[in-house]
Amino acid sequence: MAACGAEERQRTGRLSALSVYRRAAGPGRLERRRRGTPLPAGGKRTKARLRRGAAGGGGPERAAPPQGAAVSDRVERAGSSEAKQGDLKTNPSGPPAKAPAGNLETKSPGGPLTTSVGPRAKAPAGSPEAKPPGDPATSPGGGGVPGLLRRLGRLEDSRRRAAELFRWLVAPAAPEEFARQHWERAPLLVQRGDPGYYAGLFSTADFDAILRSGDVHFGTHLDVTSYAEGVRETHNPVGRALPAVVWDFYQNGCSLRLLSPQAFSTTVWHFLSILQEHFGSMAGANTYLTPPGTQGFAPHYDDIEAFVLQLEGKKHWRVYGPRTSSEALPQFSSANLTQAELGEPLLEVVLEAGDLLYFPRGFIHQADCLPDAHSLHITVSSYQRNSWGDFLEKLLPAALQMALEEDLEYRQGLPMDCLGYMGVANSDAVDARRTAFVEKVQHLIKKLVDYAPIDAAMDQRAKSFLHDCLPPVLTQSEKQLSVYGFPARWQDGGPRNVDIQITKDTEVRLLHHGVVRLCNEEAGVMLYYTTENSRVYHKEEPKYLEIDPEYTDSIEFLLSSYPNHVSVDTLPCDALEDKISLATLLFEKGILTTKKPLVQV
């Protein structure tokens, strides 16, 4: 508040910090609208600078946490737009013009790389097409997304739950078609004409409730952003994000990005915890709330596969293909780009509530709000650093280490005179010694494949994935049949129902298919698991049990038997005592469930 003089500070000394901000910055956007006076250009940025105590711009973009943003500056960014009948065109100098109500306008060059899927045609009542078998989106029960998740919970196999949830996500496009034509290749646009499709997943009411009841802090959980006149700024103050401050930022034209909503919303947590099993890679999310007629982010591309779910209002999107082959499927997100660096959009569309837009990593995108509606969307992201190259980064050093230990040829010395004929300065020289040297390197590289511990490297990648994972959300039945529903309690002055009575006849199975991973490590055999993970990304260290090698066959037996139950007596351990001990240990960690509730003695 350096802008306030001593007299002003004395006059406002008893006012709240928010009142001081308002006095320093002048009336807010809403008050100006009531007075009928225009909002001065750049007003919201001046106010935001006062809040964060900085005189200049927003500074470098803060890296968002991997779980929430496997989406760093993801999913918005725009120049202004002007919507006309039959097309959406860009007007870089003025605010967005109003689009015709209810009109979903798409601009696309066509061709095989961009597909727009309209709403599912209504099938005749009673026909097989009316309710495809196994399609939870069309099964009876309603209840929006929470109802969908409950119905998925009736499926015994967690892999089927994940597959059916993904089918619902991209419907009416078929998952097989999506994998063949779009995944890592091209955007997919689904215009459903169904504003209630995502009902119950997340809403502005949820956003407000989180601000009021959650421990939300600027920068850690919430970003306040703007993008105007080619300038992208972050306006985060220090400290807790209180509703009065946050909503005043919004009133003054700033976008709000809630990082990792799964840490606050049980429904989003449940949604992502199922979906991550489909991808076999961490599934993260951010939510974006944007005021009418504004945008919060500059054009850019990301290092994740992005699924944009339009929850409320509408938003104008432009998506551009990678500019060069090196930008296709990038390892890292780009810096903010300028409008001058962009070509013609591959896809231009207004998303309305219930619509879906998918685009692969490396596809540049930007989005702005039309003046007649706010926008709330959630971006679900996955496949960050999950490429062949990322796998080889871990595999090849291990292969080389094994080759050095086991093969004399890798330990033999280099030729004494190789410095004289190798190197860039000698690259054009015609020399038989150079030819022999290159051939030797090629031979050793090819031979390295024989030492590559491919399965062990994949186990380590799976271990990393399990650390990234959200903990599973249990159905009511799973709770009753697991340690989480075990009736141990304090009663009549002492603990009751404490003993876990697992016998040789108890039938058990893994909680979910991907809940554990066996890894052979130098320290021993480790069983990594997800049931004790945090909803906050990497808040806890990886969870594992050190397993006696004689138990590995039993773990593999449980993995291969899923989703079927097996009796404890069938576990391939030498002694019955070992079978019961292992089953009890896994039950206590929430890894195993029983077919029937355990009987209390």
From Swiss-Prot:
Domain JmjC: 254-399
Gene3D superfamilies in alphabetical order: 3.90.930.40, Cupin, JmjC domain-containing ribosomal oxygenase (ROX), dimer domain
GO CC list: nucleolus; nucleoplasm; nucleus
Biological process (GO), any one: negative regulation of DNA-templated transcription
EC number: 1.14.11.27, 1.14.11.79
Compartments, record wording: Nucleus, Nucleolus; Nucleus, Nucleoplasm
Key word Transcription regulation present: yes
Superkingdom assignment: Eukaryota
Region annotation Disordered: where it falls in the sequence: 1-149
Keyword vocabulary terms for this entry: Chromatin regulator, Dioxygenase, Iron, Metal-binding, Nucleus, Oxidoreductase, Repressor, Transcription, Transcription regulation
Cofactor names: Fe(2+)
Record's catalysed reaction(s): N(6),N(6)-dimethyl-L-lysyl(36)-[histone H3] + 2 2-oxoglutarate + 2 O2 = L-lysyl(36)-[histone H3] + 2 formaldehyde + 2 succinate + 2 CO2; N(6)-methyl-L-lysyl-[protein] + 2-oxoglutarate + O2 = L-lysyl-[protein] + formaldehyde + succinate + CO2; L-histidyl-[protein] + 2-oxoglutarate + O2 = (3S)-3-hydroxy-L-histidyl-[protein] + succinate + CO2
Family: Belongs to the ROX family. NO66 subfamily.
Function: Oxygenase that can act as both a histone lysine demethylase and a ribosomal histidine hydroxylase. Specifically demethylates 'Lys-4' (H3K4me) and 'Lys-36' (H3K36me) of histone H3, thereby playing a central role in histone code. Preferentially demethylates trimethylated H3 'Lys-4' (H3K4me3) and monomethylated H3 'Lys-4' (H3K4me1) residues, while it has weaker activity for dimethylated H3 'Lys-36' (H3K36me2). Also catalyzes demethylation of non-histone proteins. Also catalyzes the hydroxylation of 60S ribosomal protein L8 on 'His-216', thereby playing a role in ribosome biogenesis.
Protein name according to UniProt: Ribosomal oxygenase 1
Gene transcribed to yield this protein: RIOX1
